[in-house]
Each structure stands twice: as structure tokens, then as C-alpha cells.
Amino acid sequence: MMNERTIITRDYLRRLRNEIDFGNLFRYMRWPHKRQDGKLIFVCPDCSESQTDVNRKTNLARCFRCEKNWNPIDMTIAVYRIDFLEAVGQLECLLPPAQRRTE
């Protein structure tokens, strides 16, 4: 569990941003999404449109209408309307066990 005294390393944040699959994240959040023509389309948490896709190379989700990008941490903050530490705590379960933070 995250709190104001939790130390989060740069490497751990990099893993959360780069190694959490958006398909898994959307399923975990029960966020509307679908695969269509090789794209992972989702409902934008800001404008509610679906002019969206996920770039697998950069692991960024993008809304072309809003012109916004999200990494998994940013998306979790936007969908749940929570702060950074809460988002990091939510995402830990989506990392493979070997990559989870150790205390």
C-alpha cells in the first residue's frame, strides 16, 4: 500500500509506465475498449469520444480528438480521479510478479 512515506524508485515508475499492457489495464478498470482493425480503441476519460488508439512501441494511449496522451499511471489517475500515489498503488497488481516492488 502506498503512503506519503513510500519510496518509489525511478526504475519502478518506468516499469509501471512501460510494461503494463493497456488491454490488461482497461480490463482491470472495466473501462470501455475494443480491438478493431488491429487498433485498441477506448473511450477517452476526458471527452468520452472513441477517436483513440494505443501505440504499442511507446505504450501511450492517445485521444486524437483531445490530442492527449496517457501512460498507464496517467490513465489510472484520469479514470479513477485519484492522486499519483493511489494510482501507483492500483497498478502494482498488473505487473508480472518478478517485477513488483519489494519492501
What are these regions (language model features)?
Residues M1-E103:
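N-terminal structured subdomain of primase-like DNA metabolism proteins
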